[in-house]
């Protein structure tokens, strides 16, 4: 951004407004933690100034030093020129009310599952007791760590195939003192022999090949391993549905995010009673399904999964 801009902009609000305008003008893509230019510009300004993310509006008229303005504008410039997701620029993403370290070793935390965690997974758990929970495809560890944070009596496993993702998850575990969370390397369930859980939560890769190839530049900074999942986005989901009953208690529950691949799943398995979760903003491609329901339809699920 130009030196002239630094001369004309004076306050926190000035910079937030300017960043919002530039981001919209540049046609940036949002969706990594924030879904609009205003919130993302606010995040970048507050981070640059070492201010809390929930800073009150009374500080909006605070005037800035020239060096502070230049630091903010440099971050804006990178966001526009390089299309780097804001969370990777700041190294931080908020999920379920918690601050996570975020970098290119794993997807930016953004799953709507955060809303379920904060609601105690009700009404889907129906008051049933949980002592052991699994976050399959844990990535940054955000789901596992948030589950452990809000449920200190649970023992939570976070599992991923990526060494890079697990290293980031370990840093987040230490950052948030998640002592009841264990991190394990496994290709889905293959390394979890003998482990059973009352609740399995998973946000696996579910983006179709065509969608992955057409994603905006912002997504190119994320590991493709966490996105691409075959022609219909269900290559991993079907394997999870097949194998989950071996690792769920008799009264266990699976919660899975499939995003835009929801319709593909419904067409493949119309007989399965998937309970599609309604969020504050509507359905987001996340379902809950009982262990006994997966067992009842295991033959068809196994047939589909084996064809992948």
From Swiss-Prot:
Alphabetical GO CC annotations of the entry are: cytosol
Keywords, comma-separated and alphabetical: Methyltransferase, S-adenosyl-L-methionine, Transferase
Q: Which reaction does it catalyse?
A: L-glutaminyl-[ribosomal protein uL3] + S-adenosyl-L-methionine = N(5)-methyl-L-glutaminyl-[ribosomal protein uL3] + S-adenosyl-L-homocysteine + H(+)
The record's InterPro entries line, in alphabetical order, gives: DNA_methylase_N6_adenine_CS, HemK-like, Ribosome_uL3_MTase, SAM-dependent_MTases_sf, Small_mtfrase_dom
For this protein, the record's SUPFAM superfamilies field holds: S-adenosyl-L-methionine-dependent methyltransferases (SSF53335)
Q: What Pfam families does the record point to?
A: MTS (PF05175)
Q: List the disulfide bonds.
A: none
One molecular function GO term is: nucleic acid binding
Give me any GO biological process, just one.
methylation
| This enzyme's EC code(s) | 2.1.1.298
Superkingdom is: Bacteria
The record's comment on protein family reads: Belongs to the protein N5-glutamine methyltransferase family. PrmB subfamily.
- State the function annotated in the UniProt record: Methylates large ribosomal subunit protein uL3 on a specific glutamine residue.
Name of the protein in question: Ribosomal protein uL3 glutamine methyltransferase
Query: Native species of this protein?
Result: Xanthomonas campestris pv. campestris (strain ATCC 33913 / DSM 3586 / NCPPB 528 / LMG 568 / P 25)
């Amino acid at each position: 951004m130009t030196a002239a801009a630094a001369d004309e902009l004076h306050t926190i609000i000035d910079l937030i407004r300017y960043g919002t305008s530039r981001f919209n003008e540049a046609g940036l893509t949002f969706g990594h933690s924030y879904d609009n230019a205003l919130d993302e510009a606010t995040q970048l300004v507050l981070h640059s100034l070492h201010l809390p993310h929930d800073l009150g509006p009374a500080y909006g008229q605070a005037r800035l030093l020239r060096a502070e303005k230049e630091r903010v504008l440099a971050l804006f410039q990178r966001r526009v020129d390089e299309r780097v997701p804001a969370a990777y620029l700041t190294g931080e993403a908020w999920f379920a009310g918690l601050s996570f370290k975020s970098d290119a070793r794993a997807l930016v935390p953004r799953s709507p599952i955060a809303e379920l965690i904060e609601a105690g997974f009700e009404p889907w758990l129906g008051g049933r007791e949980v002592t052991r929970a699994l976050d399959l495809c844990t990535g940054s560890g955000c789901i596992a760590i948030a589950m452990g944070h809000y449920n200190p009596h649970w023992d939570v496993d976070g599992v991923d195939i990526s060494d890079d993702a697990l290293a980031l998850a370990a840093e987040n575990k230490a950052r948030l003192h998640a002592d009841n969370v264990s991190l394990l390397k496994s290709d889905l369930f293959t390394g979890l022999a003998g482990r059973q859980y009352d609740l399995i939560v998973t946000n696996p890769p579910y983006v179709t090949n065509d969608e992955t190839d057409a994603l905006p530049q912002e997504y190119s900074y994320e590991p493709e391993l966490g996105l691409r999942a075959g022609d219909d986005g269900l290559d991993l989901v079907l394997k999870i549905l097949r194998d989950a009953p071996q690792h769920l208690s008799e009264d266990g529950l699976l919660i899975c995010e499939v995003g835009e691949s929801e319709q593909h799943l419904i067409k493949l398995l119309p007989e399965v009673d998937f309970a599609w979760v309604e969020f504050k903003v509507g359905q987001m491609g996340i379902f809950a399904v009982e262990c006994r329901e997966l067992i009842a339809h295991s033959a068809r699920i196994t047939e589909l999964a084996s064809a992948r």
